[in-house]
């Protein structure tokens, strides 16, 4: 008889604690509403952004250029070589402005960010 009282007391205790744990978990879920992370860069063409500028600008190796998109953190001009390599340049640099005046504005293509 003593074991049955202990067992019943134990099951009542487990039932009470279990229901309390469920209430606490529901309260915690209600306190933190679902706020999905929004990544704004997905809507911008970050593949055509410059993160650094080349120090040497050999105009004779470039076939065309295009400016970076407006969503980039740094302004830039991307020059494309005959071998289709891309070179980022500072649009404020006088040498870059000279290259721009001699080259044609080209298409914006490719999917890799420029370092």
UniProtKB/Swiss-Prot annotation:
GO process terms (BP): antimicrobial humoral immune response mediated by antimicrobial peptide; cell chemotaxis; chemokine-mediated signaling pathway; inflammatory response; osteoclast differentiation; positive regulation of cell migration
Disulfide bond is among the record's keywords: yes
Keywords of the record: Chemotaxis, Cytokine, Disulfide bond, Secreted, Signal
Domain of life of the organism encoding this protein: Eukaryota
Disulfide pairings: 49-72, 50-88, 59-99
InterPro entries linked: Chemokine_b/g/d, Chemokine_CC_CS, Chemokine_IL8-like_dom, Interleukin_8-like_sf
Principal location class: secreted
Keyword Signal annotated: yes
Signal peptide span: 1-21
Protein location: Secreted
GO cellular component terms listed in the entry, alphabetical order: extracellular space
GO molecular-function term, one example from the UniProt record: CCR chemokine receptor binding
Family membership: Belongs to the intercrine beta (chemokine CC) family.
Listed name of the protein: C-C motif chemokine 6
Gene behind the chain: Ccl6
């Amino acid at each position: 008889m003593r074991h049955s009282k202990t067992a019943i007391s134990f099951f009542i205790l487990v039932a009470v604690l279990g229901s309390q744990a469920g209430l606490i978990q529901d309260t915690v879920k209600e306190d933190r509403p679902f706020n999905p992370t929004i990544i704004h860069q997905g809507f911008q063409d970050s593949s055509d952004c410059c993160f650094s500028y080349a120090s040497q600008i050999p105009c004779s190796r470039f076939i065309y250029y295009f400016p970076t998109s407006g969503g980039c953190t740094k302004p830039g001009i991307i020059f494309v070589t005959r071998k289709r390599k891309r070179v980022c340049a500072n649009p404020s640099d006088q040498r870059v402005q000279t290259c721009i005046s001699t080259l044609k504005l080209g298409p914006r293509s490719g999917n890799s960010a420029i370092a």
